[in-house]
Amino acid sequence: MKRSRTQYAEETEENDDFNPVYPFDPFDTSDVPFVTPPFTSSNGLQEKPPGVLALNYKDPIVTENGTLTLKLGDGIKLNAQGQLTASNNINVLEPLTNTSQGLKLSWSAPLAVKASALTLNTRAPLTTTDESLALITAPPITVESSRLGLATIAPLSLDGGGNLGLNLSAPLDVSNNNLHLTTETPLVVNSSGALSVATADPISVRNNALTLPTADPLMVSSDGLGISVTSPITVINGSLALSTTAPLNSTGSTLSLSVANPLTISQDTLTVSTGNGLQVSGSQLVTRIGDGLTFDNGVMKVNVAGGMRTSGGRIILDVNYPFDASNNLSLRRGLGLIYNQSTNWNLTTDISTEKGLMFSGNQIALNAGQGLTFNNGQLRVKLGAGLIFDSNNNIALGSSSNTPYDPLTLWTTPDPPPNCSLIQELDAKLTLCLTKNGSIVNGIVSLVGVKGNLLNIQSTTTTVGVHLVFDEQGRLITSTPTALVPQASWGYRQGQSVSTNTVTNGLGFMPNVSAYPRPNASEAKSQMVSLTYLQGDTSKPITMKVAFNGITSLNGYSLTFMWSGLSNYINQPFSTPSCSFSYITQE
């Protein structure tokens, strides 16, 4: 049921798009109960949006002001009768032109117009077949898969890029885009581009043929190149051969020489094998001679000298005493010399060790007993307290015989003889004085080398040390490691010597074991270190260290004196100035 648009004239402007076609709702069709009008058709009609009947059309048909019309392009218009017409002012591009009679097409050869149709004039190999432009081909040009092709046979070929190429093999190749012939001597390409043979003497080219001029013994015959031979050269089975007689012989292709001793072949050279006494010198076989032999006018003789001479074909030895050569060479011996069978009959000294003699190393020495000593290489009498040498060098009672000994001083005397064995026997002189002052001992010490390495410091002698070891009563132990020898002077001071009173209790002179625990070499307070100078020279500093109870046994005591820093004074004598030290006593 249609409704008049006017009955809704009083509606507000927002309802101006009211659709008078059922279901009348212009705003929201999602809730419209779709009831399709019975007059819709898919031929030119459509329901869009739902519930609304509309025309279904496409360009050039459009609506304009609610009316169907057409989109008109350039050159098209509607006349007064509503008919489509073409205007005369159509814009065209070449080859078209707009004339009063209509559109005109301009063309040029090979295009033409025949029977009011545009056509194409052709000339072989082009043609038109079945209204198509075609190409007339003949081998080797072909048409394959609508493409021009080229049929090839070897050595021509086409590569993957469609390029025509030439298959080559040696000696042909391509150089600089030109076909090139590779040659090896003697073939060459001459300046004219022709292939020729390079020749060198004796080969040459004559009458366009290779020829070989020959000289004796070569010759050219109808059979070919040959050689003229004479004895001992022959030709056997087409090969040169050599006729030989002993000692020459040929084996296979080798000429050899048969040899027998003493001839040999060494390094492809014939040589003479020589035995003892013979040698080859230059090109001569000569006699080899050693020391004592010579040649005199081509005769080998004995060359003698130094007490030897020849007489009657014999060598004679002339000797003087103590030698004897009357039979075998021997040595005349005097008293005290014998041959020692146990040492391969070496000559040795025959001494009586019971009469005060002894061996010291390889030397005969005096075996000094008690009361005797050595000083500066001399045997001397050891004088005790109260004894002196008078003006006649006789032993006499000294004025100090009534001098009491000092129980507060232990010493070695102020200038003792060598009394220490450090590197070798009796090689040093130790001067030591210990004076007790209440609970303190003040000491003076010096050490002087008298022989061996201590007179000539070696690179291995970097430190010199002296050990004095005492037992639990403070008595000096004269065995190792004590450096003082058993016969050294040591005891209470009496005048300038040592008292005959034996030290039975020296604890008042011993380092305190509470202050210097034993052993204690690593504890700083158990050491006394001072700077001194080698030989008293202030340009030669060395270090002296005194260690207290450093190497002692369980119940004993010790004093150790060490001088270090000697490596800077190689080959110089070792001697130290007097140095003082102090320590706390045991009692």
Swiss-Prot record:
UniProt key word RNA-binding: no
A Gene Ontology BP annotation from the UniProt entry: adhesion receptor-mediated virion attachment to host cell
Cellular component GO terms, alphabetical: host cell nucleus; viral capsid
Keywords of this entry: Capsid protein, Host nucleus, Host-virus interaction, Late protein, Viral attachment to host adhesion receptor, Viral attachment to host cell, Virion, Virus entry into host cell
Stretch list, region Disordered: 1-23
InterPro entries documented for this protein: Adeno_fibre, Adeno_fibre_knob, Adenobir_fibre_prot_rpt/shaft, Adenovirus_pIV-like_att, Attachment_protein_shaft_sf
Subcellular location: Virion; Host nucleus
Location, primary (coarse class): virion
Pfam family, one: Adeno_knob
Factors inducing expression: Expressed in the late phase of the viral replicative cycle.
Protein function: Forms spikes that protrude from each vertex of the icosahedral capsid. Interacts with host receptor CXCAR to provide virion initial attachment to target cell. Fiber proteins are shed during virus entry, when virus is still at the cell surface.
Family in the record: Belongs to the adenoviridae fiber family.
Entry note about domains: The tail region anchors the fiber to penton base capsomers, whereas the shaft, built from several repeated motifs, allows the knob to protrude from the virion.
Assembly and binders: Homotrimer. Interacts with host receptor CXCAR. Interacts (via N-terminal tail region) with pentons.
Miscellaneous field: All late proteins expressed from the major late promoter are produced by alternative splicing and alternative polyadenylation of the same gene giving rise to non-overlapping ORFs. A leader sequence is present in the N-terminus of all these mRNAs and is recognized by the viral shutoff protein to provide expression although conventional translation via ribosome scanning from the cap has been shut off in the host cell.
Record's protein name: Fiber protein
